[in-house]
């Protein structure tokens, strides 16, 4: 009987002991959980059953909207030959993860948590123009807010293909696009939007390093929706147009100014006398110096397989003008240095150059004043050559100055007896020498007069070609300066 009473009492007390043990165990567990940091408890709570391979939406029909933003930090390089632009941007993207939401009151009012990027789902948004992997720092974490908003901030070194137009170099403006799009998901799964207003993105230069060769004019944005050729569906993409302009001061100093100075020196070289040989050697030296200058600056000029900058055409034309100037100088020197082998100036050439062209260039008075002393010198030479002396003495000699005619003349006129034969022969020899001297002086003066005529023709042609050359250089320079000014301030 007593045994039965003990068993009954034990049966009544056992459930009570078990209940107290459970209560004690729960209290111990709660005490143990309360000692863990809230960040750990929140991280374990969010990632306990999380699957990063599944798009984070509860309704699969609902697309995930990714808001993106980009700020240009620096223009690292512009490779015109390979058509590649390297930029450094601050990239930000935001999306809502419906599986990363919590109540801040349950976790010490934590509203924001950093989570490893490898532990959650991340949209596969890439840049279509990527041609190389940049050296971007690895940011292994993202921020998550309690509403489920994920913030992914990371700097990117972007190496992209860009169609660079170098025709206006060094006053060129380039427009390169960065197209952000999902590589796999259609717009029904991932949609893309702009995080900030387009006006703010366009004028944001707050972090741009503005000390380099390129100046950032603005960043334009455009949203597009396109379909692929395989009809997999429509894809959303956001384009950022990076508009940059080259600073031309360095190239103007190193390329344009030396070329301009050499052309000015070539123009000044026309003031050397056309009958001097120094002008030819001067022009050849100048042409050689310009060739060396082009060799030095050839590495500075951009080059592509599809286009040539206008400044290269400018250098080629300047070289051609120097060659034309040298050819003109050689022609003029050839005209004025024919010496005794030259023929008299043809009448048609004399009329065309010394009358028509000289009158057109207002050079008539200069030619008249230049010709006066020559004519006066010729008159003096004629007087000195014995033109008045020989007729007075020529009657005393025959054709060769013989004494026969002199004797006949003396007898016919009743003159005094002739001088001795030796004196007559000496006089005739003297007259013959005077005649030879006169003939030589006349021939030399004729040659000099022909040379002076050719010199006058060469001088007029030299002034004509100089003015034509000067007009060509000025017209070409004004055209290029106008084009470059329009491009620079457009």
Curated annotation (Swiss-Prot):
Annotated gene: HTR3A
Topological domains, Extracellular: 20-249, 307-312, 489-490
Role noted for this protein: Forms serotonin (5-hydroxytryptamine/5-HT3)-activated cation-selective channel complexes, which when activated cause fast, depolarizing responses in neurons.
Protein name in the entry: 5-hydroxytryptamine receptor 3A
SUPFAM superfamilies from the UniProt entry: Neurotransmitter-gated ion-channel transmembrane pore (SSF90112), Nicotinic receptor ligand binding domain-like (SSF63712)
Cross-referenced Gene3D superfamilies: Neurotransmitter-gated ion-channel ligand-binding domain (2.70.170.10), Neurotransmitter-gated ion-channel transmembrane domain (1.20.58.390)
Disulfide feature: 162-176
A single Gene Ontology CC term: synaptic vesicle membrane
BP terms from Gene Ontology: monoatomic cation transport
GO molecular function: extracellular ligand-gated monoatomic ion channel activity; GABA-A receptor activity
Cited CDD domains: LGIC_ECD_5-HT3A, LGIC_TM_5-HT3
Transmembrane annotation, as ranges: 250-270, 286-306, 313-333, 468-488
Location of this chain's protein in the cell: Postsynaptic cell membrane; Cell membrane
Glycan attachment sites: 33, 109, 175, 191
Membrane topology: Multi-pass membrane protein
Family to which this protein belongs: Belongs to the ligand-gated ion channel (TC 1.A.9) family. 5-hydroxytryptamine receptor (TC 1.A.9.2) subfamily. HTR3A sub-subfamily.
Region (Disordered): 401-422
Residues in the Cytoplasmic compartment per record: 271-285, 334-467
Source organism, top-level taxon: Eukaryota
Principal subcellular localization: membrane
Region (HA-stretch): 426-462
Keyword terms: Cell membrane, Disulfide bond, Glycoprotein, Ion channel, Ion transport, Ligand-gated ion channel, Membrane, Postsynaptic cell membrane, Receptor, Signal, Synapse, Transmembrane, Transmembrane helix, Transport
């Amino acid at each position: 009987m007593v045994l039965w009473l003990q068993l009954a009492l034990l049966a009544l007390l056992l459930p009570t002991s078990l209940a107290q043990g459970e209560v004690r165990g729960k209290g111990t567990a709660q005490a143990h959980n309360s000692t863990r940091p809230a960040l750990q408890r929140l991280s374990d709570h969010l990632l306990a059953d999380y699957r990063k391979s599944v798009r984070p939406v509860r309704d699969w029909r609902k697309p995930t909207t990714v808001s993106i933003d980009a700020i240009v930090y620096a223009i690292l390089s512009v490779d015109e030959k390979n058509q590649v632009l390297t930029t450094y941007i601050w990239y930000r993207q935001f999306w809502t993860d419906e599986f990363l939401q919590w109540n801040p009151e349950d976790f010490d009012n934590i509203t924001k948590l950093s989570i490893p990027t490898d532990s959650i789902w991340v949209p596969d948004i890439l840049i279509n123009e990527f041609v190389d992997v940049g050296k971007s720092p690895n940011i292994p974490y993202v921020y998550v807010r309690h509403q489920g908003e994920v913030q992914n901030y990371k700097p990117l070194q972007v190496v992209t293909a860009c169609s660079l137009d170098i025709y206006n170099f060094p006053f060129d403006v380039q427009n390169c696009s960065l197209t952000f799009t999902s590589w796999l998901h259609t717009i029904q799964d991932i949609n893309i939007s702009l995080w900030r207003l387009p006006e703010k993105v366009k004028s944001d230069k707050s972090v741009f390093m503005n000390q380099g060769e390129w100046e950032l004019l603005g960043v334009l944005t455009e949203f597009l929706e396109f379909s692929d050729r395989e009809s997999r569906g429509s894809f959303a993409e956001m384009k950022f147009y990076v508009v940059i302009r080259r600073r031309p001061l360095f190239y103007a100093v190193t390329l344009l100014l030396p070329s301009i100075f050499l052309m000015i020196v070539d123009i000044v070289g026309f003031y050397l006398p056309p009958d001097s040989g120094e002008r030819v050697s001067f022009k050849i030296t100048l042409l050689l110096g310009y060739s060396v200058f082009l060799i030095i600056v050839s590495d500075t000029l951009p080059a592509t397989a599809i286009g040539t900058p206008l400044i290269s055409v400018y250098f080629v034309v300047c070289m051609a003008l120097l060659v034309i100037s040298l050819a003109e100088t050689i022609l003029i020197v050839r005209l004025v240095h024919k010496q005794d082998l030259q023929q008299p100036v043809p009448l048609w050439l004399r009329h065309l150059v010394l009358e028509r062209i000289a009158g057109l260039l207002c050079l008539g008075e200069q030619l008249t004043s230049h010709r006066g002393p020559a004519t006066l010198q010729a008159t003096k030479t004629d007087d000195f050559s014995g033109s008045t002396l020989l007729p007075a003495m020529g009657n005393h000699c025959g054709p060769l100055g013989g004494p026969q005619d002199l004797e006949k003349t003396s007898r016919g006129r009743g003159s005094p007896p002739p001088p001795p034969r030796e004196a007559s022969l000496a006089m005739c020899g003297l007259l013959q020498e005077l005649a030879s001297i006169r003939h030589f002086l006349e021939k030399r003066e004729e040659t000099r007069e022909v040379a002076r005529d050719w010199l006058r023709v060469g001088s007029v042609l030299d002034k004509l070609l100089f003015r034509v050359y000067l007009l060509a250089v000025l017209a070409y320079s004004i055209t290029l300066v106008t084009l470059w000014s329009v491009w620079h301030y457009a």
